[in-house]
C-alpha cells in the first residue's frame, strides 16, 4: 500500500501545465491543475462561453484559468476554437505520457428536459463524434455552431477520442451546458490516477 501511495503522489504532484498561444487573431493563456478542486478563473470576453468553461472546470475538478483576448469584433469563432486548442494542449501537457491514468470515462448528464452523454478515451488518437443539434442559431451572443468547433479543438489537441451525444432536449442552454458537464464528468474519471497501473499506460500494447 505504501508503494502505491508513493506512486500516486509522485504522479499527481506534477500534473499541472501552463500553455500560451499568440496569433494575429487571438492571444490566449491557460493554466490547468488536473488534481485540483474545480476552481475556475475564466475571462474570454464571451459571457456564455465563460459560463460553459466554468462548468467544465467545476465538474471535472480540474483547476482552470483562461485568459483570452480575441478579435471578437469580427465574430467569436477564433476565440472559441483557439481556446479549445490551448486547453487541450494544457491537459495533454499535464498528462505527460498519459501513463498511469484510468484512460476511459463516460457520463450521462440530465438537465431538466435534456439528457446528454459523453465518452472519452485519452489515447493520443484524436477523434470527435458530435451528435448535437440546436433549435436556435445563437445562445445569447454566441453561435451554437461554435460548440462543435470548441470540442473538436479540445479533442484534437488533448489527445482525446471524444464522443458527445445529446439524446434528447429542447432548451438550447440546457443542451449546451449538459454537453460541457458530461464531458467534464467523463474527463474526471479518465484522468484519475490508478496506482495499480504503476505509472504504465492502460493499454495491451504497453504504450499509447
Curated annotation (Swiss-Prot):
Superkingdom of this protein's organism: Bacteria
GO biological process, one term: L-histidine biosynthetic process
Cell location: Cytoplasm
Annotated disulfide bonds: none
CDD domains noted in UniProt: IGPD
Key words of the record: Amino-acid biosynthesis, Cytoplasm, Histidine biosynthesis, Lyase
Any one cellular-component term (Gene Ontology): cytoplasm
Classification via Gene3D superfamilies: Imidazole glycerol phosphate dehydratase, domain 1 (3.30.230.40)
Pfam families linked to this entry: IGPD
Pathway(s) it belongs to: Amino-acid biosynthesis; L-histidine biosynthesis; L-histidine from 5-phospho-alpha-D-ribose 1-diphosphate: step 6/9
Similarity-based family: Belongs to the imidazoleglycerol-phosphate dehydratase family.
Name the UniProt record assigns to this protein: Imidazoleglycerol-phosphate dehydratase
Organism: Hyphomonas neptunium (strain ATCC 15444)
Designated gene of the protein: hisB
Amino acid at each position: 500500500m505504501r508503494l502505491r501511495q508513493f506512486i500516486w503522489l509522485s504522479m499527481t504532484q506534477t500534473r499541472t501545465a501552463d500553455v500560451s498561444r499568440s496569433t494575429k487573431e487571438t492571444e490566449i493563456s491557460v493554466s490547468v491543475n488536473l488534481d485540483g478542486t474545480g476552481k475556475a478563473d475564466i475571462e474570454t470576453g464571451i459571457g456564455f462561453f465563460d459560463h460553459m468553461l466554468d462548468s467544465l472546470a467545476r465538474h471535472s475538478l480540474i483547476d482552470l484559468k483562461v485568459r483570452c483576448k480575441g478579435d471578437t469584433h469580427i465574430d467569436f469563432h477564433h476565440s472559441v476554437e483557439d481556446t479549445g486548442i490551448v486547453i487541450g494542449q494544457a491537459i495533454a501537457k499535464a498528462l505527460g505520457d498519459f501513463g498511469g491514468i484510468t484512460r476511459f470515462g463516460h457520463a450521462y448528464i440530465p438537465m431538466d428536459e435534456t439528457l446528454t452523454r459523453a465518452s472519452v478515451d485519452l489515447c493520443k488518437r484524436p477523434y470527435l463524434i458530435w451528435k448535437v443539434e440546436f433549435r436556435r442559431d445563437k445562445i445569447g451572443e454566441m453561435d451554437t455552431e461554435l460548440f462543435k468547433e470548441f470540442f473538436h479543438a479540445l479533442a484534437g489537441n488533448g489527445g482525446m477520442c471524444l464522443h458527445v451525444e445529446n439524446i434528447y432536449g429542447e432548451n438550447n442552454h440546457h443542451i449546451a451546458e449538459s454537453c460541457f458537464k458530461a464531458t467534464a464528468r467523463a474527463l474526471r474519471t479518465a484522468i484519475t490516477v490508478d496506482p495499480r497501473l504503476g505509472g504504465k499506460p492502460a493499454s495491451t500494447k504497453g504504450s499509447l
